[in-house]
Amino acid sequence: MASLSSLVLLLAALILSPQVLANYENPPVYKPPTEKPPVYKPPVEKPPVYKPPVENPPIYKPPVEKPPVYKPPVEKPPVYKPPVEKPPVYKPPVEKPPVYKPPVEKPPVYKPPVEKPPVYKPPVEKPPVYKPPVEKPPVYKPPVEKPPVYKPPVEKPPVYKPPVEKPPVYKPPVEKPPVYKPPVEKPPVYKPPVEKPPIYKPPVEKPPVYKPPYGKPPYPKYPPTDDTHF
């Protein structure tokens, strides 16, 4: 019996080994569970079989604590609802007829003038109230230091000054008295005559040089000045 059971276990291990062990060449493909529609089976009425009551001793089963299954919250994408534009409803203007209100004429009420007699009010003389002089302690005010204000340098544009033409100043001619120089009598120096041989110079013919006629300028350098204002 033991050998038969061991043989059966070996055969089952050999048959189930490719299904139980991991196959790295052909990994298992996940197939989602298929839900088959329930097949209606009519109830089969079997005759009641008498089974004597079997009294089994009570078996203690500890309570099975299942870990809580985490279900992530399902986030539904927001559904876009386009704004509904209602067409404007035309409401005709309601014209109320004008209500006529007749003018109310009130009769004039005569009010006689009220003459009040003059009331004499004697002058009230108040005694002088003495107010002692109030001496306030001096309030210390710290000196206020103002930060220096930056003033950028002011660049003045150059002022054009036209050239000033001064009129010529008349200077009268200075007449110096003549200085008398007595004649200097030098003794005659005798120079013997030097006889130079005559040097022949061929006549040089110069071309005529054109000289334009020289005339004075039509106006003087300075305008004539009147000597009477000096």
Swiss-Prot record:
GO cellular component term of the entry, any: extracellular region
Keywords, ordered alphabetically: Cell wall, Developmental protein, Repeat, Secreted, Signal
Function: This is a developmentally regulated putative cell wall protein.
Source taxonomy: Eukaryota, Viridiplantae, Streptophyta, Embryophyta, Tracheophyta
Sequence repeats: 27-31, 32-36, 37-41, 42-46, 47-51, 52-56, 57-61, 62-66, 67-71, 72-76, 77-81, 82-86, 87-91, 92-96, 97-101, 102-106, 107-111, 112-116, 117-121, 122-126, 127-131, 132-136, 137-141, 142-146, 147-151, 152-156, 157-161, 162-166, 167-171, 172-176, 177-181, 182-186, 187-191, 192-196, 197-201, 202-206, 207-211, 212-216, 217-221, 222-226
Subcellular compartments: Secreted, Cell wall
Region entry Disordered, spans: 78-230
Tagged with keyword Cell membrane: no
Residue span of region 40 X 5 AA approximate tandem repeats of P-P-[VTIY]-[EYGP]-[KN]: 27-226
Name of the coding gene: PRP2
Signal peptide segment: 1-22
Pfam families on file: Extensin_1 (PF02095)
Main location: secreted
Ranges annotated as biased composition (Pro residues): 78-223
Similarity-based family: Belongs to the plant proline-rich protein superfamily. ENOD12 family.
InterPro entries: Adhesive_plaq (IPR002964), Extensin-like (IPR003883), Proline-rich_CW_protein (IPR051308)
GO molecular function (one): structural constituent of cell wall
Protein name per Swiss-Prot or TrEMBL: Repetitive proline-rich cell wall protein 2
